[in-house]
């Protein structure tokens, strides 16, 4: 049976970066759980902001640097920065640490695998055809310059009695090539027939390593 490796974990330190940039042997468990809670709070509060990734750095025990990659920075920043100030104060009060929040705009969300997966899942939840949603995502990604894209959905597709999976591939997707820049994202669509999983791989070219 073939063994599969996570596309991001396979390339960490080369064409992919760590989402948590810190190490502390003494407080490792506490900080790891904090990181997950911080990500959950931000993702849930700004679900419609198109958040792809949240990077967390800890220069010392009292400060946390958070970088949010989003397709709609205005939703998180708010008018005159009111929303981001409110978020920072909420996190500082909850975790009793100084929070520094940076926002990075995603210029081409069509090439962000996580946002593409969430977009497909959202369309499926709204009872759109999963085939149309998949093909539209592929077409948009290729139009924006992707060298390859694969989209897979699994579950009771179209309300079928038996769960199955379907996938579409356009272009190239060299998963075993370490210097290949491959973005990977997953999402879940909640339907009345159960959950439908969505996975997206986008090949953007090769890194200079």
Curated annotation (Swiss-Prot):
InterPro entries: KH_dom, KH_dom-like_a/b, KH_dom_type_2, KH_sf_prok-type, Ribosomal_S3_C_sf, Ribosomal_uS3_bac-typ, Ribosomal_uS3_C, Ribosomal_uS3_CS
Organism superkingdom: Bacteria
Keywords (A to Z) from UniProt: Ribonucleoprotein, Ribosomal protein, RNA-binding, rRNA-binding
Domain KH type-2: 38-107
CC per GO annotation: cytosolic small ribosomal subunit
Transmembrane segments: none
UniProt xrefs under PROSITE patterns: KH_TYPE_2, RIBOSOMAL_S3
Molecular functions (GO terms): mRNA binding; rRNA binding; structural constituent of ribosome
Any one Gene Ontology BP term: translation
Classification via HAMAP family: Ribosomal_uS3_B
Entries under NCBIfam families matching the protein: rpsC_bact
Role summary: Binds the lower part of the 30S subunit head. Binds mRNA in the 70S ribosome, positioning it for translation.
Family designation: Belongs to the universal ribosomal protein uS3 family.
Subunit organization: Part of the 30S ribosomal subunit. Forms a tight complex with proteins S10 and S14.
Protein's name according to its UniProt entry: Small ribosomal subunit protein uS3
Organism per entry: Thermotoga neapolitana (strain ATCC 49049 / DSM 4359 / NBRC 107923 / NS-E)
Native organism taxonomy: Bacteria, Thermotogati, Thermotogota, Thermotogae, Thermotogales
């Amino acid at each position: 049976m073939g063994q599969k490796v996570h596309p991001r974990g396979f390339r960490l330190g080369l064409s992919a970066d760590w989402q948590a940039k810190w190490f502390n042997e003494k407080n490792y468990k506490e900080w790891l759980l904090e990181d997950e809670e911080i990500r959950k709070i931000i993702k849930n509060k700004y679900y419609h902001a198109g958040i792809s990734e949240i990077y967390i750095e800890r220069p010392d025990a009292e400060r946390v640097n958070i970088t949010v990659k989003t397709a709609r920075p205005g939703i998180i920043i708010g008018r005159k920065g009111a929303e981001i100030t409110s978020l920072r104060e909420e996190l500082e009060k909850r975790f009793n640490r100084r929070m520094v929040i940076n926002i990075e705009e995603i210029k081409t969300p069509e090439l962000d695998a996580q946002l593409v997966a969430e977009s497909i899942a959202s369309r499926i939840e709204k009872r759109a055809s999963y085939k149309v949603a998949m093909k539209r995502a592929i077409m948009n990604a290729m139009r924006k310059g992707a060298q390859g894209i694969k989209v897979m959905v699994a579950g009771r597709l179209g309300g079928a009695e038996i769960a199955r999976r379907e996938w579409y591939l356009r272009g190239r997707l060299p998963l075993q090539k370490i210097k290949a820049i491959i973005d990977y994202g997953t999402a879940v669509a909640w339907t009345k027939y159960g959950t439908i999983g969505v996975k997206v791989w986008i090949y953007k070219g090769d890194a200079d390593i």
